[in-house]
């Protein structure tokens, strides 16, 4: 459960991301593919090279979903219900991959927002991404 302080930290940090959300989403995906090569198996039809339009496009989708989640911190299940259905029933993504992408996103944010990425903000973003991951995997059961 996100505390009021966590919610404030998440909103403030995502606000700093601003217009770079799609760019950071794509960078986090590239980072995940490089650091955890097995994640590439879910994207056999993608050009996974650096800067590919497909990775940028999916990065924008990831960023848009996270932006939506930040705007609905008190109702993540409602805000992410369709994505949860998609990932559980159609794409059948192994739940561990959400943790890997979350880690890659945290590293990406820390590299771009070093002065804003305090231990408290890091902890809040980590909790937020864990909650998002939990929601996205909730329909696997």
UniProtKB/Swiss-Prot annotation:
Coiled coil: none annotated. The keyword Metal-binding applies. Pfam families: Globin. The keyword Metal-binding applies. O2 binds at residue 58. It comes from the Eukaryota. InterPro entries: Globin, Globin-like_sf, Globin/Proto, Hemoglobin_a-typ, Hemoglobin_oxygen_transport, Hemoglobin_pi. Keywords: Heme, Iron, Metal-binding, Oxygen transport, Transport. SUPFAM superfamilies: Globin-like. Residues 1-141 form the Globin domain. GO terms for biological process: hydrogen peroxide catabolic process. CDD domains: Hb-alpha-like (cd08927). Red blood cells. GO terms for cellular component: blood microparticle; haptoglobin-hemoglobin complex; hemoglobin complex. Heme b binds at residue 87. One of its GO terms (molecular function) is haptoglobin binding. Belongs to the globin family. Involved in oxygen transport from the lung to the various peripheral tissues. Heterotetramer of two alpha chains and two beta chains. This is Hemoglobin subunit alpha-2. It comes from Bos mutus grunniens.
